[in-house]
Amino acid sequence: MQKIVQTDEITNTQAFRKGKRKRTETMDSENANSDMDKGQRDPYSGNAFLPGESSSEDEEPLAELSKEELCAKIKSLKEKLTNTRKENSRLRQSLVMLQVLPQAVTQFEELVGMAEALLKGGGTMSTSASTLWRATNNSSPDSFASTCSNSNSNSSSPVSLKPEEEHQTDEKQFQIEKWQIARCNKSKPQKFINDLMQVLYTNEYMATHSLTGAKSSTSRDKAVKPAMNQNEVQEIIGVTKQLFPNTDDVSIRRMIGQKLNNCTKKPNLSKNLNSQDIK
């Protein structure tokens, strides 16, 4: 009787183990199917390839490509990189313009108010207006942003300023920025000064100003041009000597004067052509 009971217990134990093993296998199978379904429903999760990427099964391995095919692939990638950089640059310029636009509108409104005040009561142009006038023709959005930010600090100043106050304000305001230096050709001092002055001033300003304000013996113009702000001249000299230590002040001044003379000759040439047409 005892043997029969032991035999029944062994049989029950084996049956229980078989049932437990079967349930475990069933659960593992269900989990595997669930993971497979999840991978099909969400192809971009886990180790799935991102959009725009292709798996090694879809794309032929580089080792199997010929030399011509590799060159064509490299050329295509270079073109994509160039286009991406151009688009990135365009978007950055657009972003700068969007950031500057509200401030630019405010500055122009102030200029209109200043012009109306000058027409009604007379007086001298404020530093803010003169600074904007000199940088109006600069096409760089960064240049206009810098001009607006510099002139914004003086937006609350009165329309009419004394010459001494205006001169002191210009001296405090003028500073050559790093981005302005970065835009210039640094191969030779004359090329650097030409590019730097083109960034800092408009052609109209350079054509109507001289280095010292004194009349040159070789100049054909009867009128004496006003001198540039000497603080600005010293700033240009200092920046130039940092890049070209062997260049002295006299040479740099001569180069600045040469740039001013070149801008002066252009309007005269067009005036002579117009006079010939009239004759």
UniProtKB/Swiss-Prot annotation:
InterPro entries per record: BEN_domain (IPR018379), BEND6-like (IPR037496)
Polar residues bias (residue ranges): 1-15, 134-148
Cysteines engaged in disulfide bonds, as pairs: none
Database matches in PROSITE patterns: BEN
Domain BEN: 171-271
GO CC annotation, single: nucleus
Source superkingdom: Eukaryota
Pfam families recorded: BEN
Annotated stretches, region: Disordered: 1-65, 134-172
Record keyword Coiled coil present: yes
Molecular function as annotated in GO: chromatin binding; DNA binding; transcription corepressor activity
A GO biological process held by the record: negative regulation of Notch signaling pathway
UniProt keywords, alphabetically: Coiled coil, Neurogenesis, Nucleus, Repressor, Transcription, Transcription regulation
Compartment(s): Nucleus
Principal subcellular localisation of the protein: nucleus
Coiled-coil boundaries: 62-99
Biased composition (Basic and acidic residues): 162-172
Function: Acts as a corepressor of recombining binding protein suppressor hairless (RBPJ) and inhibits Notch signaling in neural stem cells, thereby opposing their self-renewal and promoting neurogenesis.
Subunit structure as annotated in this protein's UniProt entry: Interacts (via BEN domain) with RBPJ.
Protein name: BEN domain-containing protein 6
Annotated organism of origin: Homo sapiens
Top-level taxonomy: Eukaryota, Metazoa, Chordata, Craniata, Vertebrata
